[in-house]
């Protein structure tokens, strides 16, 4: 990816604050996206990503929308609720609490990198249908929205995640890739 553009363009929002989110954001930026915004419901201080990964994302030009919880994506816009930090949870991190205020991020593609569980509320808010196991299809019923990795399969192996990533790249970019 460092050597060339693989065809990603426009504004991309990556949801999450861990190492996977940092990797997805950096890859999108290096692949030709005009603007990549990492959306996280807490502040950078509470991001689970390694400091090194965070520094690399910043160096690559990834923008950060902190204290932001996505609620809807439609017509090229990601609507987020502004969050405030409340009391600490079991992990020791202060829990995000909705403020009732909303803002918008221009976005042509959303990449959700928030863990192994499907966010049912986010899926429902965006009209994404789930199967009987509570998982979305690879190419969901919403045009331009794909599910891959743990969101599609549940907890799985790295090899399965890489296979899903290759299928996603082929679907979005239109070119088969081998890894």
Give the location of each predicted region.
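Feature representing long, continuous alpha-helical segments
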Residues: 22, 26, 68, 108-112, ...
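Hydrophobic residues embedded in beta-strands of well-ordered beta-sheets
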Residues: 76-78, 136, 145
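Cofactor-binding loop segments of dinucleotide-utilizing enzymes, especially the Rossmann-like FAD-
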Residues: 17, 40-43, 150
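A conserved FAD-binding loop/helix module that cradles the flavin
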Residues: 24, 148-179
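Glycine-rich dinucleotide-binding loop and its adjacent helix/turn
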Residues: 1-31, 130-143
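Short, well-ordered coil/turn residues at beta-beta hairpins
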Residues: 15, 107, 113-114, 141, ...
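A Rossmann-like FAD-binding core segment of flavoenzymes
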Residues: 1-9, 30-132
């Amino acid at each position: 990816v460092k050597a060339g553009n693989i065809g990603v363009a426009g504004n991309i929002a990556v949801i999450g604050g861990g190492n996977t989110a940092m990797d997805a954001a950096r890859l999108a930026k290096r692949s030709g996206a005009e603007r990549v915004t990492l959306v996280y419901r807490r502040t950078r201080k509470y991001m689970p990503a390694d400091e090194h990964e965070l520094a690399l994302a910043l160096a690559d030009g990834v923008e950060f929308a902190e204290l932001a919880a996505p609620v809807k994506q439609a017509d090229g816009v990601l609507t987020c609720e502004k969050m405030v930090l409340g009391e600490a949870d079991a992990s020791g991190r202060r829990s995000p609490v909705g403020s009732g205020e909303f803002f918008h991020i221009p976005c042509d593609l959303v990449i959700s990198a928030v863990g192994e569980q499907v966010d049912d509320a986010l899926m429902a808010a965006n009209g994404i249908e789930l199967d009987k196991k509570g998982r979305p299809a690879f190419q969901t019923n919403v045009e331009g929205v794909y599910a891959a990795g743990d969101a599609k399969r549940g907890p799985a192996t790295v090899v399965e995640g890489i296979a899903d990533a290759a299928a996603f790249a082929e679907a979005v970019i239109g070119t088969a890739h081998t890894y």
